[in-house]
Amino acid sequence: MEMLSAIAPFFMAGLLGTVFARFTGINMSMCVLLMFLYMGAKPVECIAAMLMFNVFTYFTVYSQLHVMKIKSFTFFPGVRLAIPILITIALAALNPFIGIVFFVFTFLMEIFAKIYKEMDAKSRPTKGKIGQMVVIAAVLVTIGTALVQFVPENYYYIVGGVTILIYAFVMWRTGDRRKGTAWWDKLLYASTFLTGLSGIDGTDWLTAMRRNPESVLSKCYPIVINGAMIIGLLASYAMYQYFSLGALFATIGSAVGIRLFGLYEHKEKGSFSYLTLGIAVLAALVFMIIQPVPTGFPVVPMADQTGFFDF
């Protein structure tokens, strides 16, 4: 019972955040961030948990949107799939965090390889160009993550609330998709810094408001931001030596919500939903008025009672 009472808040945070996002159009990571902060997450706990949640949850999303057969894998087709599985087991025996991240990284790369192959060969960027964009985004995510430790614990909730307001303002101001093409890439890179600082991944909002014509970065943004978040997740672990086991249970709750209710589909023509923006702004303002107290995440017994998850 002690274990269940410890993981239940995380599971419910993922589930309720996903369901609320599904029916309002608010970005899922925004909802879960507010849930985590309301649970009492401290800044370092929060950013580590959010990066973990984003990487794992969008692995679930992309694996459903791009269904793949083992034989069609690019890097490890067929029986070769045993190679990353065995490596995952070996890494998990040494360091569970590294093992888990490697597992997700492997399958995300397979999914993104499929997405890359499906792009128009004449307009898709080179693999080197994608790598360059991932590195730039990863540096920005890591810088944001490194700055988290300098934010006073009692005021970190303001970072989350203000970030949501910034996203809402940008979505409101960028309704004309034919304008802003010159600075859209700068905005996308700036969003990766906000991801590292707040844990909010605005991919669904940003891709819904893509410019016309669309830039190379915009076309590949899901690949770029997820690659950057994986690197940022590893960097956060190196800096803070903190692994949020609870975030994994939040991911499970989110996966259940996605399976039961699906995902909100933003329209790709016209302006962004004013109703969604209104709800997001209201949620952010109410949240900042509440002023959650950073008492720390609930302790998951498994993380303390066994050496396997002793970080």
Each language-model region and where it sits:
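Membrane-interface alpha-helices at helix entry/exit sites of multi-pass transporters
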Residues: 41-51, 73-76, 212-224
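Structural signal for alpha-helical transmembrane segments and their flanking helix-loop junctions
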Residues: 185-236
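Juxtamembrane transmembrane-helix boundary motif
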Residues: 1-22, 29-45, 61-196, 235-311
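Short active-site-proximal "capping" loops at secondary-structure junctions
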Residues: 37, 52-57
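Short secondary-structure transition/capping segments
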Residues: 56-59, 229-230
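Short, low-complexity cationic-aromatic patches
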Residues: 25-27, 202
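Generic alpha-helix structural propensity
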Residues: 27, 31, 47-50, 54
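Short hydrophobic/aromatic, small-residue-rich stretches within specific transmembrane helices
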Residues: 50-54, 130, 221-225, 247, ...
